[in-house]
């Protein structure tokens, strides 16, 4: 004979299933900086951003995934200084606000790295969202508007592409025609300037020169 469960037994609720913690719930969204700051990448605060951290990070992030010739990586810090040189060569005097905008145009890469264009296209939405939020916060920290005027963005982009052409052909193994299709042809630089800015510096040199140029525009 089959024994039926009693009414008391039937009325008892089943025990709850164990709650599984997802990877997202466990993920850490902040980066500890050498300054002691803790920067939340998803909700960054201007109070947690220091130029010393930016300079240190950018001087150690490689352009072109590190696929460049020379004794050192060609760092994002050195690239930034080359962009600033290209802008001055293009328009002459660079005022304080434009100079700051140029010096900070790749600043988010001190925490998210310099992702190469082909891979960036694969995860564009996620990467761009974090990058734009970080850049807006960095701008606020150093007295710039979160979103730059379109004219300023276009000028920086033109100087950035000119710098990329030189890096591609002098350091990254591109031939001129190949680079021309991607970046356009830049204005010529004096040989002494090109020789200096396209010879990869050590991380310490890149960090020092980046800070010197930044303080020229920021004034502190």
Predicted regions and their residues:
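Metal-dependent phosphohydrolase cores
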Residues: 2-220
